[in-house]
Amino acid sequence: MAHTAGVPLIVDNTVATPYLIQPLAHGADIVVHSATKYLGGHGTAIAGVIVDGGGFDWRGGRFPGFTEPDPSYHGAVYADLGAPAYALEARVQLLRDLGSAVSPFNAFLISQGLETLSLRIERHVSNAQAVAEFLTEQPNVTWVSYAGLPSSPWYERARRLAPRGAGAVIGFELAGGVDAGKRFVEALTLHSHVANIGDVRSLVIHPASTTHSQLTPEEQLGAGVTPGLVRLAVGIEGIADILDDLRAGLATAGV
């Protein structure tokens, strides 16, 4: 649909990583990652990645930033640079203007994290699948959102596009609403209560009482935040330890 409209398809592949999905192989033009998350894997570095597939034609008349001379860079016309036009403009213009250059040490940390990407993601995915299946069996959990479950509307698509697994981020709803969500998170000891994802450690957050707490209940619902919504970013700890921690939280949350 993007190409029919004459615009590039840009995909944020942060959650899946290239190990699970390679968007360029499915027709995407540009892929972006927050390398802070699973690529680095340990929550120790801040960085981002832009991957230009080099297949989009910027000369369709809708992108003057690519087809007209850039007076700030000696009149360069980026579309004339061929396949890597987007990546080159990002390097010579956006990087210059925004200063978004990763530090050498952060680059080292991301590079080091990439060496274990496949091993980590395999463990993330296997743990997340077990957690999602566990949550579906709990009486005080009303629904679970995870594309690795047959009940998910995205299940078949996930099997086709991401046969190695559906990632490690899970959403679920506690029957007791906001108070149950607070009790659940506060009772956990293995999970870290933070807003991040993509760490080797298991992470949890209850959006209604944290990230979206300044919104009215109506505004929260408009943003897709229900009262008992909990988000898990499942880590690579032993699955028995993860499930034991979740059991304790669910027992404290009540019905």
Go through the PLM ranges and name each one:
Residues 98-101, 105-107, 116, 121-123, ...:
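Conserved small-domain helix->loop->beta segment predominantly found in fold-type I
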Residues 18, 179, 241:
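Residues that form or flank phosphate/diphosphate-binding pockets in enzymes
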Residues 51, 171-173, 233-235:
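Short hydrophobic/aromatic beta-strand micro-patches
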Residues 43, 164-166, 225-228:
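Short glycine-enriched loop/turn motifs at secondary-structure junctions
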Residues 14-16, 149, 175, 235-237:
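Active-site beta-loop-alpha junctions enriched in small/polar residues
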Residues 120, 186, 202-255:
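PLP-dependent enzyme catalytic core of the Aspartate aminotransferase-like
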Residues 1-137:
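Conserved PLP-enzyme active-site core in the AAT-like
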